[in-house]
């Protein structure tokens, strides 16, 4: 009986790992198919974010299939065929929801990197608010991966990334207003993730 229980436990573990591989592979292929040729620089950024998410997942024992899949898909709303409102977190989340993507992944995409604040500035906060904010370590980790990866997919500090975003969009742009107003919350999420990675913060 013990041998059978052990065999069943091993089989269950293998099946769970296989499910993770399949889910992440599907997310990666979806992102590649719509971004690699149409938006190659955005694709490099997404690749960098997803690679960092894989490393963070291993370090923090987070739900790998959810975090890494969301990392691959977080900018899919920039794809021309997906654009609806022009606000990529919302457009990406709606698109994924329509395809039947896992709810947690959809919500993480909708809310990634404090998107609700920019949505409120744009006057569409109510549209993003229908997607629940997961909060916690996994949510923070996605923000961390996004904000510490350059547009070309290279590692960068969060403060430098914020400076780069302001320079790219220029003064007076709504994104510049958002990143300025949202910087404290964004940096706090990144700091929490860094503390978790260092073993200083556990939750």
Model regions and ranges:
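Extreme N-terminal basic, low-complexity initiation segments
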Residues: 2-10
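Divalent metal-dependent phosphate-bond-processing catalytic cores, especially two-metal-ion Mg2+/Mn2+ enzymes
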Residues: 12-17, 21-22, 34-62, 73, ...
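Short coil-to-beta-strand
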Residues: 23-26, 66
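Short glycine/proline-rich turn/loop motifs
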Residues: 28-33
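His-Asp-centered metal-binding catalytic motifs of divalent-metal-dependent phosphohydrolases/nucleases
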Residues: 63-92, 96, 106-116
């Amino acid at each position: 009986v013990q041998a059978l229980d052990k065999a069943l436990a091993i089989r269950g573990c293998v099946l769970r790992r296989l499910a993770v591989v399949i889910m992440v592979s599907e997310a990666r292929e979806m992102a590649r198919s719509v971004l690699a040729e149409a938006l190659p620089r955005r694709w490099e950024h997404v690749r960098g974010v997803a690679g960092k998410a894989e490393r963070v997942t291993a370090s923090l024992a987070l739900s790998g299939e959810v975090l890494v899949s969301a990392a691959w898909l977080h900018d899919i709303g920039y794809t021309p065929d997906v654009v609806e409102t022009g606000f990529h977190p919302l457009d990406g989340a709606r698109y994924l929801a329509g395809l039947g993507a896992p709810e947690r992944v959809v919500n993480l995409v909708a809310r990634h990197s404090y998107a609700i604040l920019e949505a409120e500035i744009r006057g569409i906060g109510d549209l993003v608010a229908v997607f629940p904010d997961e909060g916690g370590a996994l949510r923070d980790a996605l923000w961390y991966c996004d904000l510490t990866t350059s547009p070309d997919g290279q590692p960068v500090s969060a403060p430098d990334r914020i400076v780069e975003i302001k320079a790219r969009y220029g003064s007076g742009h709504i994104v510049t207003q958002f990143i300025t107003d949202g910087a404290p919350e964004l940096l706090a999420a990144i700091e929490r993730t860094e503390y978790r990675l260092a073993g200083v913060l556990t939750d």
